[in-house]
């Protein structure tokens, strides 16, 4: 088993199949690792080494390394691929789309509407992920030291309208999710079914 690799980042590129590939120079040996694109946020300055936590997948025809900036992401990845029908690329897509904290929160809360925002994840797959992992992740989240956030966001009757409006204004789905999660911490707003109020608060947060 390879727990982690530490070396210099040679390149970070998008492959023809839309995967993110990191090449790491470890003692003059180049390792190619498939990584979440979010790893860009953790890249070190030039001439500094980076530690990447790894998962090794052994196939009949090849060995594939997956890399993560933090060990909790790697551990979550391993739990995701243990779910029937969830392969490594879909697990990476889940982590990339929602991020560590929001993904764990969505699974623990059985928030399938959040999970299906990931390309390739349909309603049945989202339900299966939540069913198989919510109890495990609720316990693991505490052990991993992840923050427990209150459930936040518009009530179901207005959520779709709010999201569609913000997306139409040019915000990405990730920006929209984070904005609604952030402004939803406002107790009064969380109980508000006024679509316009949610949109105003979200835009104000995104404009900071």
From Swiss-Prot:
Gene3D superfamilies to which the protein is assigned, alphabetical: 5' to 3' exonuclease, C-terminal subdomain, DNA helicase RuvA subunit, C-terminal domain, Nucleic acid-binding proteins
A GO biological-process term: DNA recombination
SMART domains (alphabetical): HhH1 (SM00278)
Top-rank taxon: Bacteria
Annotated segments matching region Domain II: 70-148
Spans through the membrane: none
InterPro entries given in the database record: DNA_helicase_Holl-junc_RuvA_I (IPR013849), Hlx-hairpin-Hlx_DNA-bd_motif (IPR003583), NA-bd_OB-fold (IPR012340), RuvA (IPR000085), RuvA_2-like (IPR010994), RuvA_C (IPR011114), RuvA_C_sf (IPR036267)
Subcellular location: Cytoplasm
Signal peptide (residue range): none
Region annotation (Domain III) ranges: 159-208
Keyword vocabulary terms for this entry: Cytoplasm, DNA damage, DNA recombination, DNA repair, DNA-binding
GO terms for cellular component: cytoplasm; Holliday junction helicase complex; Holliday junction resolvase complex
Record comment regarding domains: Has three domains with a flexible linker between the domains II and III and assumes an 'L' shape. Domain III is highly mobile and contacts RuvB.
Function according to Swiss-Prot or TrEMBL: The RuvA-RuvB-RuvC complex processes Holliday junction (HJ) DNA during genetic recombination and DNA repair, while the RuvA-RuvB complex plays an important role in the rescue of blocked DNA replication forks via replication fork reversal (RFR). RuvA specifically binds to HJ cruciform DNA, conferring on it an open structure. The RuvB hexamer acts as an ATP-dependent pump, pulling dsDNA into and through the RuvAB complex. HJ branch migration allows RuvC to scan DNA until it finds its consensus sequence, where it cleaves and resolves the cruciform DNA.
Protein name according to UniProt: Holliday junction branch migration complex subunit RuvA
Native organism: Acaryochloris marina (strain MBIC 11017)
């Amino acid at each position: 088993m390879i727990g982690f690799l530490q070396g210099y980042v040679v390149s970070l590129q998008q492959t023809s199949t839309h995967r993110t590939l990191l090449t790491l120079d470890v003692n003059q040996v180049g390792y190619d690792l498939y990584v979440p694109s979010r790893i860009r946020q953790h890249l070190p300055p030039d001439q500094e080494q980076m530690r990447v936590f790894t998962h090794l997948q052994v196939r009949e025809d090849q060995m594939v390394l997956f890399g993560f900036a933090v060990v909790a992401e790697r551990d979550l990845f391993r739990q995701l691929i243990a779910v029937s029908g969830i392969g490594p690329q879909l697990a990476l897509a889940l982590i990339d789309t929602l991020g560590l904290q929001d993904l764990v929160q969505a699974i623990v809360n059985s928030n399938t509407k959040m999970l299906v925002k990931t390309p390739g994840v349909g309603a049945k797959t989202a339900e299966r992920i939540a069913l198989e992992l919510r109890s495990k992740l609720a316990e693991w989240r505490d052990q991993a030291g992840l923050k427990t956030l209150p459930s936040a966001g518009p009530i179901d009757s207005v959520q779709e309208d709010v999201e569609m409006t913000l997306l139409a204004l040019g915000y990405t789905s990730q920006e929209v999710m984070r904005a609604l999660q952030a402004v939803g911490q406002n107790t009064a707003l969380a109980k508000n079914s006024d679509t316009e109020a949610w949109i105003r608060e979200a835009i104000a947060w995104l404009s900071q």
